[in-house]
């Protein structure tokens, strides 16, 4: 039985996210799969990561990239078999790597056995597994909309009822008020723990306690009661790493999710920092330049509020976000420098860092010539909507280049060979044409690559407890070009200093710290003086205090 979150293994762990469809194909069908992941475990071991967060591989009609699950206890055939999954657990374990499953507990697919039963009659034992309201066709129970657009209610004529769906019409919401539903989900989680799962990422977990009659979707009144029961019945029975996805979380709410007593989760994914380059009140496609002062204040707030009262997850990339080197860095002349600078800024903070596949290579956004080359449903819908509203095609494509989820979903770039070494067949989605320059084979042959810089950062975190325990203090809060902070524990004081621009910047802090030991720097030569070169990053430490 787990007793709280103090000194847990995951506090100095680094997690690597895999989007299986785009990682490595093993059988030439153009789709990444589980045997492909197994074949790349040695690469991940070399990087130094401790856990893999695996995007969903359960059986699914793939209406929403596998987040619409039709069987929690089976594997989607395009990814492999249950035997493959068991082999992945075993091979990862041999290398000291845990597998975090991606769990959706808010809804299932409408093709799940429970829902097929639930639709048969109001008396069916599975009917109350979902959220139903009586009504008349065309007169919705209320005016709530789904996240993906359109009403959140779907009429089922044979029952004379509507079911509630916060997401796609093919993703009916589960009824967490029903103890039988909760028990089924807990038993399923325990089954995966028995199989070898080392942790879970919980998709849209802040929406399970919805109360549609009151139009409450996230952070419903019973949310934390449900989460404590979930944790008690499942995660606390093993040494799990757990992270809840909560778009609307504030630091105060995150304290509950990641309470050091271990009653809910290890940590939470919050997205406040990721929204800072989006026009307020507009859509994600409406971008504005990143204001560094705002980014610093936002991250400092999370660092300071959760210090000793919760735990942060540190990330800039995932399967839904554009590539960070293109977003906040410079993916041309200073690609290596800005990729490593951003990594330094993030990994120096308190929390568990997440690396998204290809981030460790400095993979960039993609710019396909025509909308026909894109796959992501959100992107295709936006293109159509904005054309109808009178936007120019070039203007829309510019937004897609900056923001499309497809930027994260182009296949992993393993080598300069055809299709980047991802597949011997026809890839499900085109590889970014820059794979001939940016790929893992090149990176592994260049000791100054982004890959080896990430490897060094990960090693530093493992060797120096100040990364885990040190108190955070933001320096130069109003500086629009430099992001600098210290971390301090009883033995070490560490300075993280980064230049967010493509120009040289003088930084007087470097004079004050010149007697310290340089732990890592993203330029090959050490240089005296207080000038930071374009996108330069350095960590300096005084130890023995």
Go through each PLM region and give its residues.
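Active-site and adjacent substrate-binding regions of carbohydrate-active enzymes
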Residues: 2-545
């Amino acid at each position: 039985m787990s007793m709280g979150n103090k000194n847990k293994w995951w506090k100095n762990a680094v997690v690597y996210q895999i989007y299986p469809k785009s990682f490595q194909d093993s059988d030439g069908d153009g789709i990444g799969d589980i045997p492909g992941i197994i074949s790349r475990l040695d690469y991940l071991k070399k990087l130094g990561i401790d856990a893999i967060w695996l995007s969903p591989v359960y059986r699914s009609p793939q209406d929403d990239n596998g987040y619409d699950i039709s069987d929690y206890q089976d594997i989607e055939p395009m990814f492999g078999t249950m035997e493959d999954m068991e082999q992945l657990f075993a091979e990862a374990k041999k290398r000291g790597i845990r597998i975090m499953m991606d769990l959706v507990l808010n809804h299932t697919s409408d093709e799940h056995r429970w829902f097929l039963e639930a639709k048969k009659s109001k008396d069916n034992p599975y009917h109350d597994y979902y959220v139903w309201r009586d009504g008349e066709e065309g007169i919705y129970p209320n005016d709530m909309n789904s996240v993906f657009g359109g009403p959140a209610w779907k009429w089922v004529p044979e029952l004379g009822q509507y079911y509630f769906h916060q997401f796609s019409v093919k993703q009916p919401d589960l009824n967490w008020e029903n103890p039988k539903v909760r028990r089924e989900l807990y038993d399923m989680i325990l089954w995966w723990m028995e199989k070898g799962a080392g942790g879970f990422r919980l998709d849209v977990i802040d929406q399970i306690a919805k109360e549609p009659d009151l139009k409450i979707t996230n952070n419903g009144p019973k949310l934390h009661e449900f989460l404590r029961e979930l944790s008690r019945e499942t995660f606390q029975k093993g040494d799990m790493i757990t992270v809840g996805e909560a778009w609307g979380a504030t630091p105060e709410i995150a304290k509950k999710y990641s309470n050091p007593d271990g009653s809910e989760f290890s940590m939470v994914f919050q997205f406040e920092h990721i929204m800072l380059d989006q026009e307020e009140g507009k859509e994600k496609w409406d971008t504005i330049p990143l204001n560094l002062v705002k980014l610093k204040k936002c991250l400092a707030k999370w660092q300071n509020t959760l210090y000793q009262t919760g735990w942060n997850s540190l990330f800039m990339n995932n399967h839904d976000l554009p590539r960070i080197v293109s977003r906040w860095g410079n993916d041309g002349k200073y690609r290596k420098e800005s990729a490593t600078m951003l990594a330094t800024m993030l990994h120096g903070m308190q929390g568990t860092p997440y690396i998204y596949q290809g981030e460790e290579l400095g993979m960039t956004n993609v710019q396909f010539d025509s909308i026909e080359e894109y796959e992501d449903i959100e992107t295709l819908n936006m293109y159509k909507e904005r054309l109808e509203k009178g936007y120019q095609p070039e203007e829309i494509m510019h937004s897609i280049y900056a923001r499309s989820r497809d930027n994260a979903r182009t296949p992993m770039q393993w080598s300069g060979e055809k299709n980047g070494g991802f597949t011997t067949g026809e890839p499900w989605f085109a590889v970014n044409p820059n794979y001939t320059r940016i790929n893992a084979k090149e990176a592994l042959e260049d000791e100054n690559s982004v890959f080896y810089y990430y490897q060094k950062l990960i090693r530093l975190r493992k060797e120096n407890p100040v990364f885990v325990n040190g108190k955070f203090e933001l320096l130069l809060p109003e500086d629009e070009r430099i992001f600098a902070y210290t971390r301090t524990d009883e033995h070490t004081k560490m300075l993280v200093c980064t230049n967010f621009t493509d120009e040289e910047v003088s930084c007087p802090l470097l004079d004050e710290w010149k007697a310290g030991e340089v732990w890592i720097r993203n330029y090959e030569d050490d240089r005296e003086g207080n000038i930071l070169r374009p996108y330069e990053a350095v960590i300096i430490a005084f130890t023995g205090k």
